[in-house]
Design a protein with these regions (language model features):
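Membrane-proximal intracellular helices of multi-pass ion channels
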Residues: 1-484
């Protein structure tokens, strides 16, 4: 990798840091509104440090002439998440008086929209800290795509390359130029956040709670302003609004753009969307009926509670209404399986994504047909289009390394001393970016604060690998990547 490319990457990272520093003004204003100026200095100092480092990278970074190759984009993508997390953790250290390990874990959980937390006492926590956590989700949800696509074209870098390295969306392009798509997506993201906040406010939350949860839910993140998560609010309207926002955040944003550009039935016609919604509704009905039979809840209450928790896990959001691990072994195993599903490709959700299951099903059907008709030429199709061999290779490679990554992280957590339930569910929830795990320690009613520091760093790596879909990060450790 050339020195000019590294300097250009440093320049772009500097712009990211400057943007991060400026965004810290929002929690500062929040603190002033709530008359909590005692925490103001923490964000002020963190902002100054971040801004200074950003300026240094910008001034020293950009060479006279340079272009990033596609391979350089992988370093930029991974580097941006790590560098931003490094500085975004500073306010948490200063306000919450926690170790940098805990602060980095919380920040990586926020930026990757995982939602696992080491903090408690959220109901009385600093409003500046709460809004900052929600902002990390919100910024992570969009993946800094809007900013990156606005900046990279100025540097003569194709913005769609960053789309490809941060997202598994391989659907057709909905706009001729990536920066046009980015503009639409940012407007949609802002609009959905605003609509969600207003709806939650109307349903019974305070404006501050509504804004925090709108940012957390649309990004499928999961941070809340209460230790009890959504269980803190008993109004059914709040729960149903949350379900809708989580689903909206889990649908392909490119199809929203297509809808706005005149393709009115783009979402409805998409096989991935239909499969995702169908899977959710079927799971709601099945598990809701099961909970009604095995509890004292009315059917409507059981259906609502299940809808929130199932949608939360499937969309990798991580909010909860009650502790579903207390429902029995069937529920525990079911929610563990649901951890892997994920939302739609091209959304803010994590996990394996629905389209991979659908492509695998299409491959199974074609293989069975081939067994019946050995000499027939059977074309593999998905969503009406032939499945390219590169897509199949990518799916198989990703699925293999996805499984291996979870297994290795779980083994590492067990080696550190965690019980097998905490180790396995912790690894799965980190790589799938879900949030809560299973068991009494990291389940919906617990948090990650009691874990050893080594376990937190290992889970942090898992969050990053999962968010960037593993291969984007793993390519950096191959010798051939650095050879030329």
């Amino acid at each position: 990798m050339s020195l000019a490319a590294l300097r250009l990457i440093a320049f772009i990272l500097g712009i990211f840091l400057i943007t991060l520093a400026v965004s810290m003004a929002i929690p500062m204003v929040t603190l002033l509104v709530f008359d909590r100026s005692d925490d103001l200095s923490a964000f002020l100092w963190a902002s100054l440090v971040t801004f200074t480092c950003g300026i240094l990278l910008v001034v020293r970074g950009r060479p006279e002439t340079a272009q990033l190759r596609p391979r350089d984009m992988y370093l930029l993508t991974t580097g941006s998440w790590v560098v931003v997390c490094t500085f975004a953790a500073l306010p948490m250290v200063l306000i919450s008086h926690i170790s940098y390990t805990d602060a980095f874990f919380e920040t990586m959980s926020g930026i990757t929209t995982t939602g696992s937390t080491v903090l408690s006492g959220l109901d009385t926590a600093s409003p500046g800290l709460l809004i900052w956590r929600s902002m990390l989700h919100w910024l992570g949800g969009i993946g800094f795509i809007g900013m990156a696509v606005a900046i990279l074209p100025l540097l003569r870098v194709g913005g769609m390359r960053l789309f490809q390295t941060e997202s598994s969306d391989w659907s057709e392009k909905v706009t001729p130029r990536s920066h046009v798509a980015a503009k639409y997506i940012l407007i949609l993201y802002l609009s959905l956040t605003g609509i969600g906040a207003i709806a939650l406010w109307a349903a019974g939350m305070t404006p501050f709670e509504a804004l925090n949860h709108a940012m957390s839910l649309i990004s499928t993140g999961g941070f809340s302003t209460s230790d009890a998560s959504l269980g803190h609010w008993t109004q059914p309207a709040i729960h149903w609004v949350a379900v809708v926002i989580m689903i909206l955040g889990s649908l392909p944003f490119t199809l929203y753009v297509a809808t706005l550009r005149g393709h009115r039935f783009a979402l409805i016609k998409d096989k991935q969307v239909r499969g995702f919604i169908g899977f959710l509704v079927a799971t709601w009905l099945a598990v809701g009926t099961w909970l009604y039979v095995h509890s004292e809840h009315s059917w409507l209450d059981a259906f609502r509670i299940v809808a929130v928790n199932v949608t939360s896990v499937v969309t990798t959001t991580g909010v909860a209404v009650g502790d579903y691990t207390l429902w029995g072994s069937f529920a525990v195993l079911l929610f563990f399986y649901l951890t892997f599903v994920g939302g739609c490709s091209g959304s803010t959700a994590g996990g394996l994504k629905i389209f991979r299951f659908q492509v695998a099903a299409a491959l199974l059907v074609s293989s069975l047909k081939q067994l019946i008709h050995p000499r027939a030429v059977i074309q593999k199709k998905y969503n009406g289009h032939p499945i390219d061999e590169d897509i199949l290779r990518s799916l198989l490679t990703f699925s293999f390394f996805f499984t291996i990554t979870i297994a290795l992280i779980a083994l590492g957590l067990a080696l550190i001393g965690l019980d097998w339930t905490t180790a396995l569910s912790g690894a799965a929830t980190a790589v799938c970016n879900v949030g809560p795990g299973l068991g009494t320690i990291i389940g919906p009613a617990g948090n990650f604060s009691s874990l050893p520091d080594a376990a937190k760093w290992l889970l942090t790596v898992g969050m990053l690998l999962g968010r960037l879909e593993i291969l984007t990060v793993l390519v950096l450790i191959t010798p051939v990547f650095w050879r030329y």
